[in-house]
Amino acid sequence: MGRPLHLVLLSASLAGLLLLGESLFIRREQANNILARVTRANSFLEEMKKGHLERECMEETCSYEEAREVFEDSDKTNEFWNKYKDGDQCETSPCQNQGKCKDGLGEYTCTCLEGFEGKNCELFTRKLCSLDNGDCDQFCHEEQNSVVCSCARGYTLADNGKACIPTGPYPCGKQTLERRKRSVAQATSSSGEAPDSITWKPYDAADLDPTENPFDLLDFNQTQPERGDNNLTRIVGGQECKDGECPWQALLINEENEGFCGGTILSEFYILTAAHCLYQAKRFKVRVGDRNTEQEEGGEAVHEVEVVIKHNRFTKETYDFDIAVLRLKTPITFRMNVAPACLPERDWAESTLMTQKTGIVSGFGRTHEKGRQSTRLKMLEVPYVDRNSCKLSSSFIITQNMFCAGYDTKQEDACQGDSGGPHVTRFKDTYFVTGIVSWGEGCARKGKYGIYTKVTAFLKWIDRSMKTRGLPKAKSHAPEVITSSPLK
């Protein structure tokens, strides 16, 4: 009887334990929630939220590495760290002229807007000559980080220190009448630049040996062998000069009243031409204001030559130093179709003027290599050619006193009869003498260019020559011929 009772009691106990087990054990998901780690409040940087970084770093000391772990970006970390470590260097707004300031450790950097430079963007580069010619109308020079403008002869500097005001009715370098339609000359860009390889070395042909005698009287009737028709330069192509478009053009005429060379009017008494032209006629005169050699238009005038000044280093074999100045017996009266071209300043000309894309050449030369002389004055826009291409194209020596201009394939060029004539370059509606038509291999031949005397190499020489009055009169009625190499 006792054993059955024990079995009943044991079964009841086990059933109770099973019921109690349901309250002692929970499911795995519930257990994981209970045992999960609770995030510590205000734990150090590796546990902080990004938005609380600056607040937390003010309460405790941060390291760069800890800040980098939060931002996960070097630029953002550096931006915060520079200010956090030593303060904001840009707080005082040190950058001028709307420059953007960037803070650094113990320093700052300014990113300047275009046209400004310097530590604080305080320098206005647009005023310097390398940009927009310093806003100068003509010559631009830099002195102590500022621009100094100046003008050619016949102009005065305006009160604003930039503009050039003519002092007379026919100033140099101005066309005496603007064409109604856009001309070739007007189409010449004054902002375009020549090829990057064009460089002009600092050289002046007037810097000669001081022991040389600057003046020697020569026999004007002496003749000299020519280089040959195919090499004498020389307008093929181009267009006619309209009224007032080429007023600086002069024409050298022989005893038969035939034009044989050109020239450039420099002033009322002086004409610039090529030295090799002096040996193509025993006697000659200078005609100005001519646009049509077969028709008188009323503005033409003929002047006798009083003194001929030829560079004494002119070499007939190479045509080096191919330059001469003529002094007239009577002054030129400036008017429609008769006005001088401007002489530039050398440094400005080589850095600014001769880096333009094109120049203008004019003359009465042949219209093609074996053709007749043109009876009408023509003009042609010719691009400057980089020196390396110039030298490679020529069968003859290209000296430092020469430069190339023209087209290697286009059938446009100067030609026989244009020699000595003007090569001018336009800058802001003023034309400056940059070359003298000298020579070339044929006319408009493929792969060949026109060769010009580089006037910028002779500006001192020209200035000295224009101050020369000549030697005592010779008995001959022919003009004096002086070989001149003015000293430095």
From Swiss-Prot:
Changing residue 262 to D: In FA10D; uncertain significance. SUPFAM superfamilies: EGF/Laminin, GLA-domain, Trypsin-like serine proteases. Belongs to the peptidase S1 family. Its EC number is 3.4.21.6. Residues 86-122, 125-165 form the EGF-like domain. This is Coagulation factor X. The active site is at 276 (charge relay system), 322 (charge relay system), 419 (charge relay system). Residues 183-203, 476-485 are annotated as: O-glycosylated at one site. Residues 32-40, 183-234 form a propeptide. It catalyses: Selective cleavage of Arg-|-Thr and then Arg-|-Ile bonds in prothrombin to form thrombin. Plasma; synthesized in the liver.
